[in-house]
């Protein structure tokens, strides 16, 4: 069995790491390079950086941050936010990203996922899916969770896999920042529908929630922000807890 990964997520805006609840109410969590260094030392398997207010004016800022982090941190970095063209993927990879996450542009231009995967390989293309429960299914939202698309999240996941996404970063908007646990039904539905790895995101409040994400949600990796940024738990504690519960992790 492949080791399950623990991935701290750093939401970056204006050069700072922030954390919100349900995609709003952001509070400052610190300097990205310092935080990344700390996670590297604590044994994180990977780091995910999301430029959550990515626009043309701070696009270069995230490149500088990626370069600074990549020069100090030697675990895989996934970077997303504002990726609109294959050239953006190239720039992030050149800056030191190992994987590039595409979210809004995957919806507005699905061909981008295929073109990027064809050029750089599926292993470095992640599609981020922000999903919200609507009636009896989950709908995909874009633009940092502000825009409804009408797309069914499970069908969308299958389409993204078929276009070449090598991993899916799945966030439950209903659970984001609430610390009530992953939306396990959503995670499981998408895990069962595709063969590529699923990173579960949105809602971790306890270490048991991470175990549940893997066990019940069938996630390949669990992503968390608040519980790590504000010192409630350390990455090594999370790994030890998962190991005690029979989940294979890299210690």
Curated annotation (Swiss-Prot):
Cell compartment(s), UniProt = Cytoplasm
Q: Name one Pfam family in it.
A: His_biosynth
Q: Which domain of life is it from?
A: Bacteria
The catalytic site is made up of 11, 130
Q: List all disulphide bridges recorded for this chain.
A: none
| GO function terms (MF aspect) | imidazoleglycerol-phosphate synthase activity; oxo-acid-lyase activity
The reaction(s) catalysed by this protein are: 5-[(5-phospho-1-deoxy-D-ribulos-1-ylimino)methylamino]-1-(5-phospho-beta-D-ribosyl)imidazole-4-carboxamide + L-glutamine = D-erythro-1-(imidazol-4-yl)glycerol 3-phosphate + 5-amino-1-(5-phospho-beta-D-ribosyl)imidazole-4-carboxamide + L-glutamate + H(+)
Known pathway: Amino-acid biosynthesis; L-histidine biosynthesis; L-histidine from 5-phospho-alpha-D-ribose 1-diphosphate: step 5/9
Where is it chiefly localized?
A: cytoplasm
The entry's keywords:
Amino-acid biosynthesis, Cytoplasm, Histidine biosynthesis, Lyase
The record ties this protein, via InterPro entries, to: Aldolase_TIM (IPR013785), Glycosyl_amidation-assoc_WbuZ (IPR020021), His_biosynth (IPR006062), HisF (IPR004651), IGPS_HisA/HisF (IPR050064), RibuloseP-bd_barrel (IPR011060)
Classification via SUPFAM superfamilies: Ribulose-phoshate binding barrel
Q: Which GO terms describe its cellular component?
A: cytoplasm
Q: What class of enzyme is it?
A: lyase
Query: Would you kindly state one Gene Ontology biological process term found in this protein's UniProt entry?
Result: L-histidine biosynthetic process
What is this enzyme's EC? 4.3.2.10
Q: How does it assemble?
A: Heterodimer of HisH and HisF.
Q: Which NCBIfam families match?
A: hisF (TIGR00735), WbuZ (TIGR03572)
User: Tell me, what does this protein do in biology?
Assistant: IGPS catalyzes the conversion of PRFAR and glutamine to IGP, AICAR and glutamate. The HisF subunit catalyzes the cyclization activity that produces IGP and AICAR from PRFAR using the ammonia provided by the HisH subunit.
Family named by the database record: Belongs to the HisA/HisF family.
Q: What is this protein called?
A: Imidazole glycerol phosphate synthase subunit HisF
Lineage, broadest ranks: Bacteria, Pseudomonadati, Pseudomonadota, Betaproteobacteria, Nitrosomonadales
**In the UniProt record, what gene is named as encoding this protein?**
hisF
